[in-house]
Amino acid sequence: MKIHELPQEVILKIAAGEVVTGCFSVVKELVENALDAEATTVEVEIKAGGKEYIRVSDNGIGMLPEELKMAIKPHTTSKIQCIEDLERILTYGFRGEALSTISSVSRMRISSMPDNADLGLTIEISGGKIVREKSYIGPKGTTVEVYDLLFNTPARRKFLKSQRVEGRMVTEIVQRFILAIPDAGFKYIRDGELIYDLTPAERILERIPVVFPELSTTDLLEVKEETSGISITGYITFPERTRFNRLGEMVFVNGRYVRQPELNYAIEKGYGESLEKGRFPFAILFISVNPEMIDVNIHPQKLEVRFSNPSLVFDAIKRAVRNTLRTSGTSILRIEKRPFPGSSTNYSGIQQDTKKQESDNPEKARGYGTHLRETHWEQRDHFEKRKVPLHYQPDNELLLNIERTASRRFEKTEAKETGEPRLFGVFGERYILAETKDGLLIVDQHAAHERLIYEKLKKAAKIQSQKLLSPIRLTLEDSRKSLLREKKNDVEKLGFQISFEGDRIFLTGIPSILSESVAVNALNEVLDELRLEGLEEPEKIFDHLLSTLACKSAIKTGDRLSESEAKELLEKLLEEEILFCPHGRPVSMLIRFKDLDRHFSR
């Protein structure tokens, strides 16, 4: 086949494949156009998740009739004039692709009334071609309506997600703009239901509870740092206020939401050791830099940026988070006040049911312990510099030869030969220590208990539910709320009982294995699991949710086990031959006598 030039129609549809990846991407592009047009109020409406209908209206400066007809042509824009402008982008858009690519794969109507004009224009487009135009009189600004997205590319339309999933993704896009531009008003309507109707806010602090209703102002620490031409502002949460995913971490660079793992990593590094493994803080951070320091033209949807000095930005974020925590008196070390190992106070029974308030509270049962202030951090550095040298250097192969039980199964015959393992106790309120014939067995109490609960729940025909005397009204952000409506049956199989009364949602029953104090948090994490995994098969959904429920109801780090409880857990672990928790983490490890002997040159 000879080389030839592609028709314009084909070029547009190829470009649309990069820009239009779902209904959410159409909303994103149209809202960005509205904000670039100096809009102070933006209204978004969708139907059927956006697959049937999308509308974005604004009160911006509008377009003259001749500009409007030009705007749907490829590579037409008002935002840049020359190549040098690409080095100092101050707007959301600049490529001149959005309207042309969206109109090429949909039916579209655009009405615009320019500022200080008596007459505007409405045009109707189908598959990229204007099929009708007429005069328009209306309020200042622009309204774009998109119908039947991807109607002329059925092969791509079938890859759109379900209406509910597409709708949730649109909601998340709207939420990002709500946070990014607090001084703009936003109205959001989904399938005729008013979700948000927000007037301009003076501070971002007013918008955070809208997007994250589980947060209150007392959970938040203000971040304000400026260094080396980089300004970082926003809010983070205390180390105890976390979630099991990064959905609570949002970073905006020059007002633009970006999705870059290295920036999330910088936030988490700023917390030092204060975060429990597998837990992530809430962080809404705004990074302002000279536009010439970043390149926003590296991602089709502009979700990533390239920094001229990425390490400088990384260090600035880490320092901003760390300084904020120190100023609040929060330690970035995890140090706990516990009884001396081996003392008689090392064991205490775990209170059950509703009395188990302290250990069931996710903010108290994570093992964060006493907070150190900045002076203690400095003392720690001082002590590290005065380490006493040893005459004998340990054999590093000891660490390499530690044999995890994840790599081999316990043989039941071994248990018979050695009798029951001899329990030493619980170390650090997280690890059970026991002697076997081969060496020292160390068991993660949470991981082991989590797997035992998971297996028990899996064998049960139905998880028992206990009715609450006083129903709890749930305050859920919109993505969780819509997901709960969609997956109500799956959630109720776990023992949660849900009641919808208009736009209000009540928790009327909880799994019998959970206390009331952790039930709402457990439900939120179940919903987040569904949202992140996007599971559709009922068996996979149920299995995945069981593991989440088991994790929430299991013994936590910081929960003190009595000697009999630790022994019972150890016996069940060996009896069931459990190697991993439901999330794949090993539950135990074995340090063999021969490795200890080699370490001590015996």
From Swiss-Prot:
Protein's UniProt name: DNA mismatch repair protein MutL
A GO molecular function held by the record: mismatched DNA binding
SMART domains linked to this entry: DNA_mis_repair, MutL_C
SUPFAM superfamilies: ATPase domain of HSP90 chaperone/DNA topoisomerase II/histidine kinase (SSF55874), DNA mismatch repair protein MutL (SSF118116), Ribosomal protein S5 domain 2-like (SSF54211)
PANTHER family associated with the record: DNA MISMATCH REPAIR PROTEIN MLH, PMS, MUTL, DNA MISMATCH REPAIR PROTEIN MLH1
Keyword Magnesium: no
Function: This protein is involved in the repair of mismatches in DNA. It is required for dam-dependent methyl-directed DNA mismatch repair. May act as a 'molecular matchmaker', a protein that promotes the formation of a stable complex between two or more DNA-binding proteins in an ATP-dependent manner without itself being part of a final effector complex.
Gene Ontology BP, a term: mismatch repair
Chain positions covered by the region annotation Disordered: 337-367
Residue spans of biased composition, Basic and acidic residues class: 353-367
Entry keywords, A to Z: DNA damage, DNA repair
Gene Ontology cellular component terms for the protein in this record: mismatch repair complex
DNA damage found in the keyword field: yes
Start-end of Polar residues biased regions: 342-352
Protein family: Belongs to the DNA mismatch repair MutL/HexB family.
Organism from which the protein derives: Kosmotoga olearia (strain ATCC BAA-1733 / DSM 21960 / TBF 19.5.1)
Domain of life: Bacteria
